[in-house]
C-alpha cells in the first residue's frame, strides 16, 4: 500500500484486480476544497490509457513488479527467449507480450523484462537503439515532395522514415517507443 502522495511515473498499481502503470501525475491543490492527484494510467496488459483522479493521501494498492535486465537470445517461432545474465535462467515470453518491441530487438541485445507473480508483463527497450539500414532507395537531389524523408527497412525488418542522405548500410539511432529516426551513428 502506498499513499497517492507517493505516486511517481512507472509505479504499477493494482486497481480492481488489474495492473495499471502511472504514466503521468499531477498534485492539485485548489483554492477551495481538498487537494487531489490527477493521474494518467496505462493498463499493463491491454495498453488502454485512462485518466483517474484520487483524493490526496488516499491509500492505493501497489503491485510488486520485478524489473530485471535480460539478454534477448532468439525467437523460437512462438516465444521470444531471454536469459538472465546473473543466473543464466532462460525465460520464454509470448509474442503478444513483447509487442512492438520485437521490431527493434537484435539477438544479444539488453532489455528489461518486467514480471509480476513470475508472469511476464512487458519488455522495455532502451530509450534509443542502433540498427543498420538493410534497404533504402537512393535519395534523389531536389526530391522534396515527401518532406525530405524516405522509407528505410532496418536489419530487424522494421520500416521507418529516414532523411534522404542516408544509404543502405548506414547505422542509425532509432527511438523504439515510436519508431522515430534520431540520428546517424558515426562509423569512426
UniProtKB/Swiss-Prot annotation:
Pfam families noted in UniProt: EFP, EFP_N, Elong-fact-P_C
Swiss-Prot/TrEMBL GO biological process terms: peptide biosynthetic process
Location(s) in or outside the cell: Cytoplasm
Signal peptide: none
GO molecular function: translation elongation factor activity
GO (cellular component) term, any one: cytoplasm
Keyword hit for Cell division: no
Keywords associated with the record: Cytoplasm, Elongation factor, Protein biosynthesis
Pathway membership, UniProt: Protein biosynthesis; polypeptide chain elongation
PROSITE patterns associated with the record: EFP
Matches recorded under Gene3D superfamilies: 2.30.30.30, Nucleic acid-binding proteins (2.40.50.140)
CDD domains per UniProt: S1_EF-P_repeat_1, S1_EF-P_repeat_2
Family (UniProt): Belongs to the elongation factor P family.
Function, in words: Involved in peptide bond synthesis. Stimulates efficient translation and peptide-bond synthesis on native or reconstituted 70S ribosomes in vitro. Probably functions indirectly by altering the affinity of the ribosome for aminoacyl-tRNA, thus increasing their reactivity as acceptors for peptidyl transferase.
HAMAP family (UniProt xref): EF_P (MF_00141)
Protein name: Elongation factor P
Source organism of the structure: Saccharopolyspora erythraea (strain ATCC 11635 / DSM 40517 / JCM 4748 / NBRC 13426 / NCIMB 8594 / NRRL 2338)
Gene from which this protein is expressed: efp
Amino acid at each position: 500500500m502506498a499513499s497517492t502522495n507517493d505516486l511517481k511515473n512507472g509505479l504499477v498499481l493494482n486497481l480492481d484486480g488489474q495492473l495499471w502503470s502511472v504514466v503521468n501525475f499531477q498534485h492539485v491543490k485548489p483554492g477551495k476544497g481538498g487537494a487531489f492527484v490527477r493521474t494518467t494510467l496505462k493498463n499493463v496488459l491491454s495498453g488502454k490509457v485512462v485518466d483517474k483522479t484520487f483524493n490526496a493521501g488516499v491509500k492505493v494498492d501497489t503491485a510488486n513488479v520485478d524489473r530485471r535486465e535480460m539478454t534477448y537470445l532468439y525467437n523460437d517461432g512462438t516465444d521470444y527467449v531471454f536469459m538472465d545474465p546473473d543466473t543464466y535462467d532462460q525465460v520464454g515470453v509470448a509474442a503478444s507480450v513483447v509487442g512492438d518491441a520485437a521490431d527493434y530487438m537484435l539477438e544479444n541485445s539488453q532489455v528489461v523484462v518486467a514480471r509480476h507473480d513470475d508472469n511476464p508483463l512487458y519488455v522495455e527497450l532502451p530509450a534509443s537503439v542502433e540498427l543498420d539500414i538493410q534497404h533504402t532507395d537512393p535519395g534523389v537531389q531536389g526530391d522534396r515532395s515527401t518532406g525530405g524523408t524516405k522509407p528505410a527497412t532496418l536489419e530487424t525488418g522494421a520500416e521507418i522514415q529516414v532523411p534522404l542522405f542516408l544509404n543502405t548500410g548506414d547505422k542509425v539511432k532509432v527511438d523504439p517507443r515510436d519508431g522515430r529516426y534520431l540520428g546517424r551513428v558515426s562509423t569512426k
